[in-house]
Amino acid sequence: MGDLNLMRTDSKKLFQAGLALALDTWAEAGAAGFDWSDVDYFIAHQTSVVHIRAMANALGVPESRFPLSLPTYGNIGPAAVPFTLAREVDRLSSGMRVLLLGIGSGLNTSYAEITW
């Protein structure tokens, strides 16, 4: 939000837009036949614990399936996805499903599934 000289951010609106976009993407993928009900871990871009908790609740996924690096290392931006995955590698075993999630300022989102 803003213009060429100044960016202004409405954090609440960005949060709401990002969550809505993530849910829309989830629904579209489900309509196309993707079933993530048995995904073992959801590794997300971590801007805050509030955001992760809201996403988990909105998707109906237990928060325990969203490993966090944020409380220890802070917001490390998009690097949180591979960083958190690397921290969880000892918990993963062959055949486990991991969903990587990224949401960019409420404007874009992507998911990628890895079968370990």
What does each model-identified segment do?
Residues 12, 20, 78-81, 112:
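Short capping/connector residues at structural and topological boundaries
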Residues 69-81:
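Active-site-adjacent helical/loop segments in soluble small-molecule enzymes
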Residues 25-26, 55, 81-88:
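Buried hydrophobic packing segments
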Residues 1-70:
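Hydrophobic pocket-lining "lid/loop/helix" segments that shape and contact the acyl-thioester
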Residues 84-116:
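Conserved beta-strand-centric core segments of catalytic alpha/beta enzyme folds
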Residues 50-53, 78, 107-110:
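Short active-site-adjacent structural elements
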